[in-house]
Swiss-Prot record:
Gene: zip-4
Comp. bias intervals (Basic and acidic residues): 275-298
Stretch list, region Disordered: 1-20, 147-205, 238-257, 273-318
Residue ranges of domain bZIP in the record: 228-291
GO biological process: defense response to Gram-negative bacterium; DNA-templated transcription; regulation of transcription by RNA polymerase II
Residue stretches in coiled coil: 242-280
Signal peptide: none
GO molecular-function terms, A-Z: DNA-binding transcription factor activity, RNA polymerase II-specific; RNA polymerase II cis-regulatory region sequence-specific DNA binding
Keywords linked to the UniProt accession: Coiled coil, DNA-binding, Nucleus, Transcription, Transcription regulation
Designated name of the protein: Transcription factor zip-4
Entry-linked Pfam families: bZIP_2
Gene Ontology terms: cellular component: nucleus
Tagged with keyword tRNA-binding: no
Tree of life domain: Eukaryota
Length: 318
């Protein structure tokens, strides 16, 4: 056990208490003292833990009034180039020290153009970008078609080559709900951004379809035969026949459409005539009923002249 008694020094003599008097240890560091040689790295960690525990238990008022030499504390931590084999993980301070040793330096994540657009917006510019004013000089030279051809070829080549953009490592841990982890062997990196959420319906096996019709036989012609003029003549005649058949089919379709429109107009006209005929029949039936009633009334009462009957008939018609 260490002699850890507090003793205030003689302030008038200017002799403050020394740390080695409190701990019975040498002044030149407990962990790497060449003279003593009794402490190793593991012992220095244990010593630091014991000193920290005693600092927690001591009276804070006495602790503030006494003078301590912090070189021993600093020496214990500066000599720890490699973490100890057996670390006391129950101690909170040692856990913090171990985390600091193992933690890598912070590196700013590299964003691709899409993530930069989402994070900073379309108007964001990196510092030092667009500083050269020469880039804004306008070029009024009109290029001919021959000069434009190599540029179009370059752009077409650049569009065909597709570069796989890797997702930054800082976004690998984040996954949305229902999203499955993807491997590079199954599909490309770009396809993983736009893959829809997996569903249980896709897991079901697709039934096999058996075609009921037979496909016509088609054999590809060799390149030598395609170069011959006879083959070109056959292809020209065939194309001409195909165009004629297509034009004829279009004409027949137009003729059918015209006949269909005429039939629709004729049907509407006949329906209107039929409706007018029905209305005329209804009027005739009502008139006949009215005449019968008048005849019955005249037979019971005084007779009316035939002239009055005809006048009433004409009025009802008009």
């Amino acid at each position: 056990m260490y002699n850890y008694n507090y003793s205030r020094g003689n302030k008038s003599m200017g002799n403050p208490p020394r740390f080695h008097e409190l701990t019975d240890m040498p002044d030149n560091g407990a962990s790497t003292s060449a003279a003593a040689g009794m402490f190793t790295r593991q012992d220095s960690l244990a010593l630091a833990a014991s000193l920290q525990q005693r600092d927690r238990e001591r009276n804070p008022v006495d602790f503030m009034e006494t003078q301590l030499d912090l070189d021993n504390y600093l020496q214990c931590f500066t000599d720890l180039d490699v973490p100890a084999d057996n670390v006391d993980l129950n101690d909170a301070e040692l856990q913090k020290a171990n985390i600091l040793y193992d933690d890598d330096s912070y590196e700013q994540p590299q964003l691709n153009p899409y993530e930069r657009h989402v994070a900073y917006g379309p108007g964001f510019r990196n510092p030092g970008e667009y500083e050269e004013q020469d880039g804004y000089k306008m070029n009024f030279e009109v290029k001919t078609e021959e000069e434009k051809k190599p540029e179009t070829m370059k752009t077409s080549k650049t569009m065909t080559t597709r570069r796989a953009i890797k997702r930054p490592s800082c976004y690998d841990d984040y996954q949305e709900e229902g999203e499955t982890s993807l491997s590079d062997n199954d599909e490309s990196v770009d396809d993983s951004y736009y893959k829809p959420k997996s569903s249980k319906k896709t897991a079901a096996a697709v039934p096999n379809f058996v075609p009921k019709t037979k496909a016509r036989k088609y054999n590809l012609k060799p390149d030598k035969e395609k170069v011959e003029p006879i083959y070109k003549l056959k292809r020209a005649r065939n194309n001409d026949a195909v165009r004629k058949s297509r034009n004829k089919a279009k004409e027949l379709q137009l003729q059918k459409d015209e006949e269909y429109d005429e039939m629709k107009k004729r049907i509407t006209q006949l329906e209107a005539e039929l409706q007018s005929e029905r209305e005329g029949r209804e009027r005739d039936q009502q008139l006949i009923k009215q005449l019968i009633r008048e005849k019955e009334s005249t037979s019971k009462g005084p007779r009316k002249s035939s002239r009055n009957a005809l006048e009433s008939f004409n009025k009802s018609n008009y």
